[in-house]
Amino acid sequence: MTIARTARTATTTTRIIHTPADMTQWIGRAEPFETARARYWYQLAQPYEAQHIGLIGFACDQGVRRNQGRIGARAAPPLIRRAFATLPVIADLQQRFDGQLSTLLGDAGDIHCDDNDGFAESTLEQAQIKYADAVSNVIKQGGLSIGLGGGHAIAYGSFLGLWQTLESQKNADVAPTIGIINFDAHLDIRQSDVATSGTPFRQIAEHLDAHDQPFHYCCIGVSRFSNTAALFDRAEQLGVQVISDEDCHYQPWDTLTDRVKNFVDQVDIIYLTIDMDCLPSSVVPGVSAPAAFGIELGFVERMVRTIMTSGKVKIADIAEINPTFDIDSRSCKVAARLLATMVEQHLLST
């Protein structure tokens, strides 16, 4: 990666910190003239203490910089939270968890990667490890960890957090199989001399291979104009199940959902990740790598709901929102809607 090698000539001072939840981000409208059922997520969120769901921010776009993308995604986590905070809590959840609403959602803070806008040796790797520790803490307490990126290098940190948890809970001869479902225009299995936002699933494949574990990876929304022939060759070698953006538009829903359900049936645990550049730039202008075509928001939301109802999703994340290029908070609002879909479906499926 030319940009990575060039950037190494400069010395960059870095800092990786895990900041606690900033509850001032959780604000919204008041409803003094409505009934108690006029509830919003900002009224339920608390600092994370073993709630059903733990939100963790990954305020890092060092991987995007290394991947020659446009930086700015590290500013996204608090803005996605704020957009989500203003959404109403649906009636089904209020009824099902009556008297227990404070147990639904916790904010576990943010992992900050301060790289002074330059290439920083090992900074991304340190941030991924610290993020993995936070993820593992949520999963070990029985919660669903949902990460808010940041660049898609969050994916390797998410996987490490899940792996760390499974290693600490080993009590059987056969390890549970992990399946990864990624909504993304890019395969993110690049070869590089450094980790980037374009390498996480290759890194995961290599990690699993080193531990004699299978690599189960389904990528939905892949664009033939966003991946080289070399990447498609590698996907075939790794046994990646590829569902293209054109498939998502032109193939019947039943055909596609059967493919995804068959994938889910083959594994014990699902890691679900959404790179927001899978959607058209007309819908989400604020991303690191905007898509000319993309897949429909309704399709993504419906498929996410299908995957979540399996009960196998133990970790999820949303990546690549870049507020620098957003318009009227449009992209953050779409991310918040998908976050709400994950949250609602997980809670209704428990």
Report each predicted region and the residues it spans.
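Conserved alpha-helical scaffold segments that buttress catalytic/binding sites
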Residues: 2-350
